[in-house]
Amino acid sequence: MINNNKLKITARQQIKRNAGGMTMSKIQMTTPLVEMDGDEMTRILWKMIKDELLLPFIDLKTEYYDLGLEHRNETNDQVTFDSAEATKKYGVAVKCATITPNAARMDEYDLKEMWKSPNGTIRAILDLSLIHI
């Protein structure tokens, strides 16, 4: 069992003998992971990581937040605040890279306004000085 007061995972590695070989049950999560999806290629990479490396071995429980620029625009950036509050609640999160808009991105994405950096917003809410991605 892994327990760092924030993430609690109970590993059930019960090996069962089947007719065709051995199988292991998945690691069970007791605390959900706050999943902050990002923009562009990071969406694809995160999905590959989940599908290939995590889901086959872990009964992955997540609370999903789409921090892609289009969705932040649709929600007036409320999704960024909600994801940070969920991180405070559960104590563990994965955040993918996001776009901080500039003038060119404002036109490209037809943004309502030039939204602040999600990293800066999340750092302020969580009282952090640095986010490692």
Task: Outline where the language-model segments fall.
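Contiguous, glycine/small-aliphatic-enriched amphipathic segments in soluble metabolic enzymes
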Residues: 24-129
